[in-house]
């Protein structure tokens, strides 16, 4: 399939529009979570809504901006708090509040929207998660955020309607 340069640019703009729509919806969902619900870990779940929120922020920073090596927008300890394989039961030290995470999520979206659309065509230094280009990685990042959005929605419903283990 041959795509014109103009068509490619429009497709790239669409990716950034998806980030905007997805992030705004993510923020709307976490705004609807009460303070009492954010650190509850329902039966059958390894993490909390608080963790999922920080995880989305941290992994998006990692994939879109090279965190922790290429960006200093987030504290370095976010990898220990919210990186893959982490859990709230292991948290020690300074853990950001949900309010802080919400501000950082909004800031991150603004920075994502500043990425030049043509950058999505750039090849990655080495394939990551099956992705060869930055645009492919952006697509996986969008899917990742949507997956965790679903987890948060499920957890909220369970917390509201069923027993919890905390």
Where are these regions (language model features)?
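A structural signal for long alpha-helical coiled-coils and helix-turn connectors
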Residues: 34, 64, 113-116, 120, ...
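Short, contiguous alpha-helical
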Residues: 16-20, 27, 37-84, 126-166
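Short Lys/Arg-rich basic patches
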Residues: 11-15
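Extended low-complexity intrinsically disordered regions
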Residues: 3, 83-87
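Acidic/histidine-rich alpha-helical segments that form the ligand environment
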Residues: 86-125, 136-141
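Conserved catalytic core of Hanks-type protein kinase domains
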Residues: 32, 52-55, 115
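Amphipathic alpha-helical packing segments from all-alpha helical-bundle domains
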Residues: 24-29, 108
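Short, Lys/Arg-enriched N-terminal segments with co-localized hydrophobic residues
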Residues: 1-10
């Amino acid at each position: 399939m041959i795509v014109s340069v103009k068509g490619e640019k429009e497709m790239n703009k669409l990716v950034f529009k998806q980030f905007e729509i997805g992030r705004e919806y993510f923020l709307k969902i976490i705004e609807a979570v009460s303070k009492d619900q954010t650190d509850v870990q329902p039966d059958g779940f390894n993490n909390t809504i608080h963790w999922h929120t920080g995880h989305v922020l941290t992994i998006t920073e990692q994939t879109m901006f090279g965190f922790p090596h290429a960006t200093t927008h987030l504290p370095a300890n976010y990898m220990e708090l919210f990186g893959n394989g982490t859990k709230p039961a292991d948290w020690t030290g300074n853990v950001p509040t949900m309010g802080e995470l919400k501000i950082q999520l909004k800031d991150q979206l603004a920075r994502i929207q500043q990425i030049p659309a043509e950058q999505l065509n750039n090849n990655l230094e080495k394939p990551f998660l099956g992705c060869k280009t930055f645009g492919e990685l952006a697509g996986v990042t969008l899917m990742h955020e949507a997956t965790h959005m679903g987890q948060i929605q499920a957890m909220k419903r369970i917390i509201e309607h069923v027993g919890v283990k905390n």
